[in-house]
């Protein structure tokens, strides 16, 4: 009899714990620390909330937060509806936002930590900087859920202590291959802010088009696709300011000396090499073109373009390219005593002083400059390398003392798996039975498609020493736009890139070191629904059945622990 009572007691306790657990709202990215109390639901009227802050940026962010709460009427799955009869109204409508130092600028490595406390006494956000407080508001926005009684509640009192694991949590977009409208770029910034990503790397131009209007060389935009596909100086400044207001840095990239044709040749055709060659003879994709490293005019133009853009883009970091330099483009200049490596070294010797004249400048380059067949012996150790080749490059570079941003094409190239795009390619006709051609039928050079699970499971600091790990600034997903424009930009990126957001914010392991992909599944599926509620056209990841029936679509009934 006593045993039966004990069994019943423990069963009831287990059921109680299940109910308590099910009622908790999980936000994305998962915070470092969340403590839920076992008390009653807190009823909040978002229309009555007011921010207790003197910071205009935070006041505007608070207005957006309240608007999103009311617009989304968010209720995550599979949380049961709340009976608010036993709930308690919050005692004050003031949201207290305390910032220790509101003067700190948004730059690489800024303190983004925050603490959020919600109970019946009120809502309090405490952060070291304005940028941490923005993250606190984003978390608050996801925690307040809507009920069938048309009320808004937080399931119980909760305390969140949070900070990111990595300084750089990035996304790269490319407006050189296909134009991206201002509105489509702003949408990416919105979703980045919602997922606490902080770095938008903007590959502004490429050999195909130059969409950036410059006062120093106004005729460069003759190589824009049309008059409607141009970014004015005001457009650029608006995007930078819009992003900053949401805690997102905008890092510009002008790819040099490779991938350079459009725009540059409008200034002076002599500063571009191999522009008239057929592309397969001189480039990795059409059209060909690289800057003439031997011409003094080249460096005059580089200086003027770079300085004007540095006045517009306020971030300390500027990406100056240096990828995929093609030896065959310089065939007319090469000799046994003047190799393409010699040309690259000469370019760096002349270009680096130009780049470093800007105060507080931090340069980023693609890893090609040290790891490709055409590479320099060394570059200054204060240059950050973006690793897109083999993942072994991370250890190679960090062991040599370089900071890196990881963008492995095997895990983080979002354009992969979309099939080849070069037209009239007879190889598809000649070898239809060869499923291995160009990584298989479809011809994507970097297939397969990078799913959210592939992204989330990527351990990008594996086999690194602690010293080497300290040189990893973070990770960045990259979407090259050969097959992307504004019509599909958001759906190509989201919600799978939210896996990267969590991976770089709090990681993919729990406090015991166990992989938490099992619990992340429902978190990212809900985050997708949340984005849809806010009006964003993001891709479904699974049939909705899987969202409504958590883990019914898992491969294994009893998932392995690893």
From Swiss-Prot:
Induction record: By growth on N-acetylglucosamine.
First and last residue of the signal peptide: 1-22
UniProt-listed Enzyme Commission number(s): 3.2.1.52
Catalytic function, reaction form: Hydrolysis of terminal non-reducing N-acetyl-D-hexosamine residues in N-acetyl-beta-D-hexosaminides
Pfam families, sorted: Glyco_hydro_20, Glycohydro_20b2
Positions glycosylated per UniProt: 38, 52, 111, 337, 382, 396, 463
Coiled coil: none
Function as written in the Swiss-Prot or TrEMBL entry: Has a broad substrate specificity.
Protein name, UniProt field: Beta-hexosaminidase
Source organism: Candida albicans (Yeast)
Gene responsible for this protein: HEX1
């Amino acid at each position: 009899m006593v045993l039966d009572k004990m069994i019943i007691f423990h069963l009831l306790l287990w059921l109680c714990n299940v109910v308590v657990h099910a009622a908790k709202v999980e936000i994305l990215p998962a915070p470092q620390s969340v403590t839920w109390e076992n008390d009653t639901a807190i009823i909040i009227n978002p229309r009555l909330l007011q921010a207790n802050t003197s910071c205009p940026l935070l006041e505007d962010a608070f207005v957006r937060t309240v608007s999103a709460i009311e617009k989304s009427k968010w209720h995550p799955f599979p949380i049961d509806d709340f009976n608010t009869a036993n709930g308690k109204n919050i005692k004050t409508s003031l949201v207290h936002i305390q910032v220790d130092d509101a003067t700190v600028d948004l730059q690489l490595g800024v303190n983004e930590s925050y603490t959020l406390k919600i109970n019946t006494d009120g809502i309090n956000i405490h952060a070291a900087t304005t940028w941490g407080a923005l993250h606190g508001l984003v978390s608050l926005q996801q925690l307040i859920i809507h009920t069938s009684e048309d009320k808004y509640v937080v399931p119980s009192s909760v305390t969140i202590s949070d900070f990111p694991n990595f300084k750089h949590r990035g996304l790269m977009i490319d407006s050189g291959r296909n134009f991206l409208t201002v509105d489509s770029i702003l949408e990416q910034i919105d979703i980045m802010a919602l997922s606490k990503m902080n770095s938008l790397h903007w590959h502004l131009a490429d050999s195909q088009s130059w969409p950036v209007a410059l006062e120093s060389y106004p005729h460069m935009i003759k190589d824009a696709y049309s008059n409607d596909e141009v970014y004015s100086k005001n457009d650029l400044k608006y995007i930078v300011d819009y992003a900053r207001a949401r805690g997102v840095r905008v890092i510009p990239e002008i790819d040099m000396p490779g991938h350079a044709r459009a725009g540059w040749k409008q200034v002076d055709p002599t500063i571009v090499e191999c522009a008239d060659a057929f592309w397969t003879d001189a480039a990795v994709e059409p059209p060909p073109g690289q800057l003439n490293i031997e011409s003094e005019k080249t460096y005059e133009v580089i200086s003027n373009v770079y300085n004007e853009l540095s006045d517009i883009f306020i971030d300390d970091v500027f990406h100056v390219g240096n990828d995929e330099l093609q030896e065959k483009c310089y065939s007319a200049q090469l000799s046994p005593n003047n190799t393409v490596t010699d040309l690259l070294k000469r370019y760096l010797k002349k270009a680096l002083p130009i780049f470093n004249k800007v105060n507080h400048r931090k340069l980023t380059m693609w890893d090609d400059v040290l790891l490709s067949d055409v590479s320099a012996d060394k570059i200054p150790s204060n240059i950050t390398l973006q690793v897109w080749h083999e993942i072994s490059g991370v250890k190679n570079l960090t062991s040599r003392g370089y900071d890196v941003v990881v963008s492995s094409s095997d895990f983080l190239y979002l354009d992969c798996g979309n099939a080849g795009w070069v037209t009239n390619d007879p190889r598809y006709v000649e070898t239809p039975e060869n499923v291995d051609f160009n990584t298989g039928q479809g011809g994507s050079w970097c297939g397969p498609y990078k799913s959210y699970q592939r992204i989330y499971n990527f351990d990008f600091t594996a086999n690194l020493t602690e010293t080497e790990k300290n040189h990893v600034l973070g990770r960045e997903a990259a979407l090259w736009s050969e097959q992307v424009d504004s019509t599909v930009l958001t759906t190509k990126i989201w919600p799978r890139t939210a896996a990267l957001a969590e991976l770089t914010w709090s990681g993919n392991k729990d406090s015991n070191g166990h992989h938490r992909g099992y619990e992340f599944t429902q978190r990212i599926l809900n985050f997708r629904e949340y984005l849809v509620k806010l009006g964003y056209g993001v891709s479904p990841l699974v049939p909705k059945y899987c969202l409504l029936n958590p883990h019914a679509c898992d491969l294994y009934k009893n998932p392995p622990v690893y």
